[in-house]
């Protein structure tokens, strides 16, 4: 869904909200699912989960030797309900900085997430929406669902 300078994405996961929140905020979990399409790894995943704390992700694809990095600063953290952080890619493929807001809502045995990205301009939003990021996001969300299932199985044992 697109509105002016926003992009929004909604997902649902079959896991309690706290576990989903942890999967978005703990480096040892994030690096297991936030990888994009097959062939990418995440050699750098640093998260200082506090207001004013920074995060840094670097993805690498061995063939053809591509690397992509991004980072930002946490502006608001309400565990396990809401995260607000800035976002800026190293290669600045869209102008300026974006502001990401992720909301986690528990609905029975499902957690619904809404990620809203506010770009500095409609141009930046348009560049991001044409980037093909949906493919990488879909692959990541599939991995996240698998990870959450594994975590719930381990917790039940």
Residue ranges and their predicted role:
Residues 1-40:
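Hydrophobic ligand-binding cavity/cleft-lining segments
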Residues 3-5, 51, 66, 96, ...:
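Residue-level preference for beta-strand/loop junctions
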Residues 20-21, 30, 55-57, 74, ...:
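Hydrophobic pocket/interface hotspot
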Residues 41-88:
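Glycine-rich portal/gate segments that line the openings of hydrophobic small-molecule binding cavities
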Residues 84-138:
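Beta-strand/loop substructures that line and gate deep hydrophobic ligand-binding cavities in soluble
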Residues 148-157:
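Short, highly charged C-terminal tails/helix-capping segments
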